[in-house]
């Protein structure tokens, strides 16, 4: 499903609500992550992207955040991510290579 250059990036964010724009930034950052990946916890997303998609997503996220108040973390799990992710718990595991049912 994904090319050889696809990689898994784990994205976590913390958006400040100290100013009125905080909720707007939060919605926009979450929407950008949802456009490229799957929410696995409230403010954590797994995104399987190729380098071009990652460049677009990262640019979009950085342009939405307030660098003085918000925090984004990117964890690059690379192309061999399948061997690096283990799921334990009640929620079903997300399989980005599985079938998509609409």
UniProtKB/Swiss-Prot annotation:
Q: Is Isomerase one of the keywords?
A: no
* Alphabetic keyword roster: Antiviral defense, Endonuclease, Hydrolase, Magnesium, Metal-binding, Nuclease, Plasmid
GO BP terms: namely:
defense response to virus; maintenance of CRISPR repeat elements
EC number of the protein: 3.1.-.-
Q: What class of enzyme is it?
A: hydrolase
Q: Which domain of life is it from?
A: Bacteria
User: What's a Pfam family in this record?
Assistant: CRISPR_Cas2
| Cofactors required | Mg(2+)
Please indicate if the UniProt record lists Magnesium as a keyword: yes
List the GO molecular function terms: metal ion binding; RNA endonuclease activity
Give the binding site residues for Mg(2+).
Answer: 14
Q: How does it assemble?
A: Forms a heterotetramer with a Cas1 homodimer. Homodimer.
State the PANTHER family in the record. Answer: CRISPR-ASSOCIATED ENDORIBONUCLEASE CAS2, CRISPR-ASSOCIATED ENDORIBONUCLEASE CAS2 3
Q: What does this protein do?
A: CRISPR (clustered regularly interspaced short palindromic repeat), is an adaptive immune system that provides protection against mobile genetic elements (viruses, transposable elements and conjugative plasmids). CRISPR clusters contain sequences complementary to antecedent mobile elements and target invading nucleic acids. CRISPR clusters are transcribed and processed into CRISPR RNA (crRNA). Functions as a ssRNA-specific endoribonuclease. Involved in the integration of spacer DNA into the CRISPR cassette.
Family, as annotated: Belongs to the CRISPR-associated endoribonuclease Cas2 protein family.
Q: Which protein are we looking at?
A: CRISPR-associated endoribonuclease Cas2
**Gene that this sequence comes from:** cas2
